[in-house]
Amino acid sequence: MNVIEALKAVKKLLQNPNHWTKGANARDINESSVNGSNPEAVKFCLIGAFDKLQWHYEELSTIDNYFAIADAKNYLRNAIGSAFISDFNDNSTHKQIITALNKAILLAKKENIQ
C-alpha cells in the first residue's frame, strides 16, 4: 500500500454518508462508540477509517503500510490546514470530508508520492 492507495481506501470507506460518523472514532450498528479497529464498527470518522485500514486488514499491518498510512494522514492534515483531523471531522459536513480527501489525494499526486 502507498499513500495514495491509503487515501483512496479511506475515501471509499467513507464515500457513503451512512458509513461516516462524528464524535467517535467509530460506531457499531447500535450507534455505540467503538474503536475503528473493532470488527463490529460500521461507521467511521476520518481517524477511525485510518484505524480500520491499518488494523482490520491483517495483510496491511506491516511497517511499510504503517508509514504509508502515517504519511497519508499528513497529506490530509495539509489538505485541511490543521494538525487536528478529529476536530476537522467533527466540525465538517460529509461533503467537506470527501472534498478534503480528494484534495489530499491531489496533493500526493502532485508531489508524485506513491
Predicted regions and their residues:
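Domain-length accessory/inserted modules outside core catalytic folds
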Residues: M1-Q114
